[in-house]
Every structure is written in structure tokens, then in C-alpha cells.
């Protein structure tokens, strides 16, 4: 069982790491540079939902046309809880990796506690596992990552943020 972690907005604000679309794209391309030396890969498997965007970028850059998903729910808003496999990797993709994942690339945005990574590793133990960001608890479970952040950091991904109007600092300047 995974312990429940409640991160309200006030707690997250002190350890916030906002990532812009531009920065995320650069980080995904940097990840691809590293992965290019490891491949080739027969398929990319995105861990949804966070792994969808980096998987698309990595697959494009590496020229991989077969993209699959494994859908695992681990967060409900800002609370991490029990893992639930909503959709497994397709049999045709598993077959490309000989059933163990050899030659397959698993991509996610972040490895946090490692719970999701551990579950996916059990499904495809020989696959190469890559994330854009890694926290210390989960880092040993991934093969390739770009940026490590502290365990108490909350990453705000660009798809979680919205552009809003910011009033001028000086009253009446607008």
C-alpha cells in the first residue's frame, strides 16, 4: 500500500518548480540526445497522462512510429494513493519487445516515489525507462533522466498551468 500524501496549495507553493512549454520541450530534446545513444527502440510506451507529451517529442526525434500507452492512476488531484492499472500495454507492443520489453522505451514526465515506475518495470522488466525529471526516491528505477529535483519539490507542468492576466505593479498604471 502506498501512503497517502496530501499536498495542499500552500504546502506546494514553497517548493514549486514551474516548467514552461519551452523549457519542457528543451528538456525532452535533451533526453532524446541521451536516448539516441541507447537505442534503437522498436516502440515508445507513454505512461499516461504525464508521459504523453514527452513520449510524442521523443518518438518524433528518434523516428519511432509505434507508440503505445500504459494508463496508471496514482494521483487524485494533489493526493497520491493506490495505483490502479486502467490500461495495460497492448499485446502487439509487448511482442515487439519479446514479452519482456527488450528494445522498448518507456517514457514518463517524472519519477517521484517510484511506485508507478516499479509497477511498469514489473510489466516490462527489460525495457529502457526514461523520464524528464527524477526525484531521489524514484531515481534508481529509471535508466535515463535529465533533471533531478528534491523529493519535496512539486513540479508544475505546462499543461497544469494557465495564462492569467497580471495587473501592473503600480496601481492605476494599466
UniProtKB/Swiss-Prot annotation:
Annotated residues for binding of guanine: 112, 155
Keyword Plastid: no
A biological-process GO annotation: purine ribonucleoside salvage
Catalytic activity of the protein: GMP + diphosphate = guanine + 5-phospho-alpha-D-ribose 1-diphosphate; XMP + diphosphate = xanthine + 5-phospho-alpha-D-ribose 1-diphosphate; IMP + diphosphate = hypoxanthine + 5-phospho-alpha-D-ribose 1-diphosphate
Residues bound to 5-phospho-alpha-D-ribose 1-diphosphate: 49-50, 108-116
GO terms for cellular component: plasma membrane
Cellular localization per UniProt: Cell inner membrane
Record PROSITE patterns: PUR_PYR_PR_TRANSFER
Family: Belongs to the purine/pyrimidine phosphoribosyltransferase family. XGPT subfamily.
PANTHER family cross-referenced by the UniProt entry: XANTHINE PHOSPHORIBOSYLTRANSFERASE, XANTHINE-GUANINE PHOSPHORIBOSYLTRANSFERASE
Role this protein plays: Purine salvage pathway enzyme that catalyzes the transfer of the ribosyl-5-phosphate group from 5-phospho-alpha-D-ribose 1-diphosphate (PRPP) to the N9 position of the 6-oxopurines guanine and xanthine to form the corresponding ribonucleotides GMP (guanosine 5'-monophosphate) and XMP (xanthosine 5'-monophosphate), with the release of PPi. To a lesser extent, also acts on hypoxanthine.
Name of the protein in question: Xanthine-guanine phosphoribosyltransferase
Gene behind this protein: gpt
